[in-house]
Amino acid sequence: MRLSLVFNPADAVRRKADNLGLLEPQFDMINNWATELESVGGVVLLSAPADNGRTTMSYSIMKLHDAYTSNIQSIEYEVEDALEGIKQIVWDSSEDGPDFATTTRSTLRRDPDIVTLCDLPDVETAQNIANSDLERTRVYLCLRTDSALKSVQTYVQAVGDPKLAAKGLRGVVACKLVRVLCGNCKVPYQPTPDMLKKLGLPEGKVGELFKKGGQVLVRNKPEVCSVCSGVGYSGQTGCFGVFELGKEEKQLIIEGDWNGLRSAMRKAGMPSIQQSALRKAVMGITSIEEVTRITAPTKSKSSSKKSKTQA
């Protein structure tokens, strides 16, 4: 018997925006940015660490716009899926020709309705974005950062002028991926009051959580789950933080008050990545271990070296 595995890279990024893992209010906000006439322009930052769904997110959000009534263009290192009605420009650093910043500037000068940039490789690209006609053009800018706040800081620093950067900002979407528990073998358990307290979950409202299994009972004997091959997980979903940047937030950006901006994002009432992940754990979609994995503080290289020296 011969088995063959066929992998189509395009399928990996071919998802609708309402199937990314966005919570309902998050999807509604992004959809409003794409469809409401009064919110035509501005920069929306799309943030995710490497290999955490940034391309899938950008493709899905682009497809919320009507490609037949809008001039939509993208600048990418590689086209991972052909998007109907969208002009996808491939920029290759190994080829002779204009650099990324120049390609960005010339694209923005053609008055497109929507432009998506796969990366922010240099400060000149950021400055070209900030100096373009952002009242008429929507720019989706992909950044390799691990939080909504960090993506705003990265963009503002690259522009070099907080007032100019803040003026054009519309919103930010941050994403991290968690693994989805296998529905065939996940194991329910009752969390302790102490555990719920540490997670910030209300006692009495969360009856059970789930953890990975990997095995199922067949005739009262444990066997490896045939669905997930014993891994305990099957697939991935996104946990998002979606925030609108209004007058208050823009003023805080101009002042460089990052703690104030963090507080303003919390007060806005939209779920953060951590809150989104916890909701998915309560819903039985993922495990607390996955929530901890994506929300635990990342150790910097300098701190790692320091700890090794001390050890």
Question: Predicted regions: what is each one?
Answer:
Residues 1-311:
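Short, flexible helix-loop junctions that flank or precede catalytic/ligand sites
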